Amino acid sequence: MERDIDIWLVGNTGLRSPNRIQEGFRIYAESPFVGNFRGRDNEIGFMNLLNERGIIHNEAGKDASGSHARKWRLMFAKNGLIYPQLKKADGSQAELGALDAITPFGRTFLAADTYPAMQECFLRAMSVEQFPLAGGSYFSPLRWTLALMLELERR
């Protein structure tokens, strides 16, 4: 069975500016939500913290569900900054790392003190992202994009 690849999935977390990510992640790293990022109360708490610090602008009553926090959690996990929740079929959470705890790569990202250093972290995160395809192979959006660019340059 063939499945169309939705290339818009690349980095689609609902965050429109990567320049806010490090500041938002620093707020997470210094918060009581590290490793405690699940559940409505914690999601709303982190969302409110982001709002108080000016990272997001949640108009009063606009988002009462904590969806902003879930977008940030997804982005942190997709970029390897925190340990994602594993499905049992994918292995042991304990072997990977504590759920929503900051990864060594997350610490590297926090330590990035220049714009090029942050860009290198983003590039590293994009270089390992892969999506499973039918037949057991994988699709890498970055590698596909680079291959396409090289082919266009060759022509």
Predicted regions: what is each one?
Residues 1-155:
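Donor-sugar nucleotide-binding helix/loop cap in glycosyltransferases
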